Amino acid sequence: MSSGLDLQPRPVPGPVPAWAFPAGVAGRVPAGPATLRCDLPGRRLAAVRLVLHAGAGREPVLADGRRLDGVATLTAHALAEGTEPGGGTALAAAFERLGASFFAHADLTALRVALDVPVTRLPAALELFAEVVRRPALDDADVRRLVRERLEEIAQEDADPGTRAMRELRAVMFPPQARASRPTGGTPESVDALQGSDVRAFYGSVVPAEATAVVAGDLSGVDVDGALTAAFEGWAATGDPLPDPDRTMPDSTARIVVVDRPGSVQTYLAFGHGVPDRSHHDWPSLAVAAHVLGGGLTSRLNAKLREEKGYTYGMRAGLLRMRHCGLFVAQGAVHTEVTADAVSDALAELRGLASDGIDADEHGASVRALADRAPAEYETARAVAAELADVSANGLGSDYPSAYLAAVRASTPDGVARTYRRHVDPEALTVIAVGDAEKISEPLEQLGYATVTVTAGEKEKE
């Protein structure tokens, strides 16, 4: 029976509008950091990102052999305490009066200090921002309070199986002397030993001339160069040079490591393999390959383990970025009783991309997902500034985002498959399983992929 409704045909998506990543204008503050100014008309919230080459990869080892693991993260937290002992609340209030927000964090590569503020108040906010980064208190009492808070954060991180799996993956793939083998934010033992003097010495060794200050937003009518010069001119290091960044490469070998969590009803799985860093011409194709495998609900890992087998709520795959290398990682949680089956099926999919290649449809879908989302992904000044800060921290140049997107679009199914085969050996994967060792170790051993070793979870270690 006809409804009599005259339905209009479904709209057909039009072509993707031409778009290019915003270009920045490079400069330098006299006797200070490099600058990168990016004018984004209509973005009335400005974003400032100061990149200091003082990440966890440059944390020193003292003469007595004590490693200052976690001092970069603790320093980032301590900057938010302001220029006076116990001044964190007053500093937050001062930024709030300007409608601004201030935060900082550290990773292996860099310590990044951030400011978001309406463009009309950018000069005043930059003045306050400069006071904080040039003359922070880094007070003993504040640092010890932050140590206690950081220890609580570490305990929370240990309770998360995904975080625990990634930490174990790095610990296994990198040798113990490599900084990347240990938690970026430090261990409970290393963090508990940190004092205010350690934080002050570390921050005093920062070389401002090696830093980069990125400013993005609608900068019309704002003397950004003048404000940056007033903020940072003459800023100099006061301490001994930091050690060179650690560049130890990962070891890609077939192994299965079980992190024991007795009674766990799920197993968190992580599959890892070393790949080149982002400066390598194969990185964009590796990103496409990772997306084909685990970039969405229709990806190969999800189609098999979620949709067909019902083992998991979702798997994902991607590239872990470090300055000197990368890691291909596939991960997700599965039911305990199907752990070995899930590993077997995941390995089959990881092998299948190498042996069978990629078809045009899934390649096209992944390219569109990675490249066509860029206009929305970089809609805000915050996103643009964060990306420019990241490429600066990794020595890639401000034209890298555009070159990366162009390379993704120019990739081909055969080229992506060849790149994957060149850099990812499915027979040399590190497999981490965070779960009940009593229930999953023997089935994993029976797979015959690699010898299974068991390490205690945090509660057992205590």
Regions found by a protein language model. Name each.
Residues 1-12, 90-241, 308-310, 314-462:
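Charge-rich, well-structured scaffold segments of protease-associated domains
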Residues 2-47:
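N- or domain-start disorder-to-order transition segments that initiate the globular core
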Residues 7-9, 13-19, 48-54, 62, ...:
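Extracytoplasmic/periplasmic mature domains of Sec-exported, cell-envelope-associated bacterial proteins
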Residues 26-27, 34-39, 200-203, 254-260, ...:
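Short, surface-exposed beta-strand/loop micro-motifs that present aromatic residues
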Residues 29, 42, 206-207, 262, ...:
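Extracellular/periplasmic catalytic domains that process cell-envelope and extracellular macromolecules
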Residues 35-56, 61, 67-71, 240-298, ...:
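His/Glu-based metal-binding/catalytic segments typifying zinc-dependent metallopeptidases
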Residues 49-119, 182, 295-311:
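M16/MPP (pitrilysin/insulinase) zinc-metallopeptidase core fold and M16-derived inactive scaffolds
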Residues 229, 247-248, 303-304:
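Short, conserved active-site entrance elements at the starts or edges of catalytic domains
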